[in-house]
């Protein structure tokens, strides 16, 4: 079995998931829309599961156990931001289950004891590739959504600094560039996750879009969001206005605000984008990045800033880099300092056992030795308890 599984490791990145029926196909924009009429079935609860589905009540006793998020809630809270392979797992198992892990519990403890009269505290999740930073961030987002926070979620900041489909000179500031398609897509997902807030929050300034259209002071923030969705040319400016209004009004105590950015290191460094004369565009010249940088400053109150630094998708960084100072660079590190670093490491023994048991309960491991202690030891050896590698190994067993 060891030789066979070793060969799988070498092939795991070469295999095309689309060729395997149990992995499903690439996720659509709303990853769980096809599950509207499906109800997750109850299974026997074992070591891998907990009946406590409220993140606010998770504690040390739940480490290594999976909790369930209803399909409807998943659609609302996570219209974007879930890892593609996790989306495949949701499709395959017909349920969405997140593992309770120590880094998320540490962060939950901090959030529960936050003094919101003080400036927003920055938390940075970091760790080696595949350790589960994004899913730990999703656990925090789910907690805040259940606590009725407004969620400002940037699922992968790296997508804003490379391979842009449409880049236009900003009408607001000629020194910057708009990304209308990226901005419009983000606004649609922001609306899905926060629709209940948008009619309640009133803009505190008048915003003029063109000679005929404007949003008056006191209008619902929903009007700004709709302007960006319906008039894609105005989407980048609409995002800037939304961020400005949220930052200002959360400080007034109107609502609690979570700023969650996956891959925040993309905000500093280099981009792949170029002007017409082929000269490079820097991140601060992109209006979306310029405005997002303002949101990760701790000069506002009434919320929290939870960030991840990630080598996945990053540009011009060593493949093995994972420490904040390595990925952020001097400018980014100095901008975010002070922050609370939270290491997301490989599974501990309890988490590893919970993951294996979860796969076994769902009949995901078909190899004849997968149920044995010998099989578990070989999976442990081959994966080194790395969550991402373990998931890929198990997908082909």
Curated annotation (Swiss-Prot):
Catalytic reaction list: GTP + H2O = GDP + phosphate + H(+)
Main location as per UniProt: mitochondrion
Keyword Cell wall biogenesis/degradation set for record: no
Key words, A-Z: Acetylation, Apoptosis, Hydrolase, Mitochondrion, Ribonucleoprotein, Ribosomal protein, Transit peptide
GO molecular-function term, one example from the UniProt record: structural constituent of ribosome
Enzyme Commission designation: 3.6.5.-
GO biological process, any: mitochondrial translation
Pfam family, one: DAP3
Transit peptide feature range: 1-17
InterPro entries given in the database record: P-loop_NTPase, Ribosomal_mS29, Ribosomal_mS29_met
Gene Ontology cellular component annotations, sorted alphabetically: mitochondrial inner membrane; mitochondrial small ribosomal subunit; mitochondrion
Main EC class the enzyme belongs to: hydrolase
Parts forming coiled coils: none
Purpose: As a component of the mitochondrial small ribosomal subunit, it plays a role in the translation of mitochondrial mRNAs. Involved in mediating interferon-gamma-induced cell death. Displays GTPase activity in vitro.
Oligomeric form and interacting partners: Component of the mitochondrial ribosome small subunit (28S) which comprises a 12S rRNA and about 30 distinct proteins. Interacts with DELE1. Interacts with NOA1.
Similarity comment: family membership: Belongs to the mitochondrion-specific ribosomal protein mS29 family.
Protein name: Small ribosomal subunit protein mS29
């Amino acid at each position: 079995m060891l030789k066979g599984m070793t060969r799988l490791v070498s092939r795991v990145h070469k295999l095309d998931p689309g060729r395997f029926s149990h992995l499903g196909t690439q996720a659509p924009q709303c990853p769980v829309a096809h599950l509207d009429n499906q109800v997750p079935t109850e299974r026997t609860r074992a070591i891998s599961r907990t009946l406590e589905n409220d993140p606010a009540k998770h504690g040390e006793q739940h480490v290594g156990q999976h909790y369930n998020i209803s399909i409807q809630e998943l659609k609302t809270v996570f219209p974007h931001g879930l890892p593609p392979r996790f989306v495949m797992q949701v499709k395959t198992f017909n349920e969405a289950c997140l593992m309770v892990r120590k880094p998320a519990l540490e962060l939950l403890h901090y959030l529960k004891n936050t003094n919101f009269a003080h400036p927003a505290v920055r938390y940075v999740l970091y760790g080696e590739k595949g350790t589960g930073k994004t899913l730990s961030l999703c656990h925090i987002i789910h907690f805040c959504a259940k606590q009725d926070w407004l969620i400002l979620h940037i699922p992968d900041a790296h997508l804003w600094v490379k391979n842009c489909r449409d880049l236009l000179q900003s009408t607001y500031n000629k020194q910057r560039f708009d990304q209308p398609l990226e901005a419009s897509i983000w606004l649609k997902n922001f609306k899905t996750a926060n629709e209940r807030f948008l009619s309640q929050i009133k803009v505190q300034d008048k915003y003029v879009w063109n000679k005929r259209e404007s949003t008056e002071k006191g209008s619902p923030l929903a009007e700004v969001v709709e302007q960006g969705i319906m008039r894609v040319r105005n989407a980048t400016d609409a995002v800037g206005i939304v961020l400005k209004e949220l930052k200002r009004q959360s400080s007034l105590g109107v609502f609690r605000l979570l700023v969650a950015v996956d891959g925040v290191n993309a905000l500093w460094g280099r981009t792949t984008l170029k002007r017409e004369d082929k000269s490079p565009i820097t991140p601060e010249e992109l209006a979306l990045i310029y405005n997002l940088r303002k949101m990760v400053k701790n000069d506002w109150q009434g919320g929290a800033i939870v960030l991840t630094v990630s080598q996945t998708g990053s540009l011009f960084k060593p493949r093995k880099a994972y420490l904040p100072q390595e990925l952020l660079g001097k400018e980014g590190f100095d901008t975010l300092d002070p922050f609370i670093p939270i290491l997301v490491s490989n599974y501990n023994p309890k988490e590893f056992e919970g993951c294996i048991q979860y796969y076994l309960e769902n009949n995901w491991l078909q190899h004849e030795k997968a149920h044995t202690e010998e099989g578990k030891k070989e999976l442990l050896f081959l994966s080194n308890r790395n969550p991402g590698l373990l998931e890929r190994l198990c997908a082909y067993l």
